[in-house]
């Protein structure tokens, strides 16, 4: 019997363009490099998600580029009202995740629980980013998620976990709660081992390249595409 494997999605965070207004051309550029999905950074200078006309434009641009909106990434320190409005884009734009960055655990727990209550009727999952300093090491984040009075998962940041120690161990630690990822383009990560661990724990969601715009976007996307191609080969080998 031949095992069929669903095609893995790869996406790009619009952090690549965060210091600009997000435009049709930006999304077209991401799609032109072969990516299927995007994560939008909820920065009002980047995307004014309070403005229904801007949300409507975003919906149209995504459709034109044939991109899915995987999720919205809410930066740390974002006001609750802005977090809510970023989430409410899901009333018009189908999306899977709202990625949040936790501060102090007690306050973060209240905010995540509040957002989870708003997100559930919209079919959106809350993912706590593992790069949050207060949630390191990985075991601390797992404890945080498991003690919430609401459902939430983990957005696993590979670069941050690598800096923190044993990456494979961290992947295994968060495995039961892993629902999305952030992936670097440049790193010293042992990808064969990391991706084997990802396959082992059963994660089938997208790999989202989360890259700051320190160089030309086109060059960065070309590099991300090469990393994607390497990932695809390694994932096939580890099946």
Write out the residue ranges for each language-model feature:
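Short catalytic-loop micro-motif centered on adjacent basic/acidic residues
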Residues: 12, 71, 126-130, 156-157
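Histidine-acidic metal/acid-base catalytic patches
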Residues: 2-11, 16-36, 84, 89-94, ...
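S-adenosylmethionine/decaboxylated-SAM
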Residues: 109, 118, 145-146
């Amino acid at each position: 019997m031949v095992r069929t494997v669903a095609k893995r999605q790869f996406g790009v965070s619009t952090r690549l363009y965060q210091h600009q207004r997000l435009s049709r051309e930006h999304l077209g550029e991401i799609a032109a490099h072969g990516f299927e999905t995007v994560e939008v950074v909820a920065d009002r200078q980047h995307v004014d998600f309070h403005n229904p006309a801007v949300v409507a434009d975003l919906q149209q641009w995504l459709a034109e580029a044939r991109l899915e909106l995987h999720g919205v990434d809410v930066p740390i320190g974002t006001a609750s009202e802005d977090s809510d409005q970023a989430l409410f884009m899901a009333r018009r734009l189908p999306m899977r995740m709202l990625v949040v960055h936790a501060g102090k655990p007690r306050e973060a727990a209240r905010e995540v629980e509040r957002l989870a209550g708003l997100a559930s009727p919209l079919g959106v999952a809350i993912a706590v980013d593992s790069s949050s300093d207060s949630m390191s090491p990985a075991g601390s984040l797992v404890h945080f998620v498991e003690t919430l009075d609401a459902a939430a998962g983990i957005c696993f940041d590979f670069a941050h976990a690598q800096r923190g120690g044993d990456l494979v161990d961290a992947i295994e630690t968060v495995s039961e709660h892993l629902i999305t990822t952030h992936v670097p383009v440049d790193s010293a990560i042992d990808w064969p081992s990391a991706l084997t661990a990802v396959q082992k724990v059963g994660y089938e969601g997208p790999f989202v390249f989360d890259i700051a715009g320190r160089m030309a976007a086109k060059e960065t996307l070309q590099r991300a595409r090469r990393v994607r191609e390497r990932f695809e080969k390694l994932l096939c080998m580890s099946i």
